[in-house]
Amino acid sequence: MPVGAGSRFSNGDVLFARISPCLENGKTAVVDFLSGSEVGFGSTEFIILSPRGEISTTWIYALAREPNFREACRQAMSGSSGRQRLSADFFSRYTIATPKEFDLVAFNKATMPLLTLMGARRDENQRLAQLRDALLPELMSGRMRVDEAGCLVSEALDEEVADV
């Protein structure tokens, strides 16, 4: 949904890059970082794909990452060679067999834990990057010794294990 100069999205939506070279490079993201019913606003250079019924976030994400689907998107792009875009109406024209509800339920049951794990690993990577960014200047300046930093890293990793 366009809002002013941007697009509106919420948790569970999949953001699909519409502009070259981002689409060709596979830029796709699951929105899972907003608080409660918070709504995010962003660039018009991605298309928002929202789950409906048993068509879950993980099913949409898997489709959006599937090479044949991405190739169909790439072929449907228009515009000058350096700034090609995929029109949002591509999705109303693209046909795909809808899986049976039983299969969708089984797929969702198998993939939702993986999506949760992806989010946890992303959060862990961010925390570790912050720790690195805080420790590196201290180590390089000599204000902190390696063994002191090692203790801080061990404590942080112990907290990570407790959180997962």
Please annotate each region the language model reported.
Residues 1-5:
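Short alpha-helix capping/helix-loop boundary micro-motifs
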Residues 54-55, 63, 68-80, 90-164:
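Amphipathic alpha-helical coiled-coil/heptad-repeat segments
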Residues 7, 14-65, 69, 77-87:
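A short beta-sheet element
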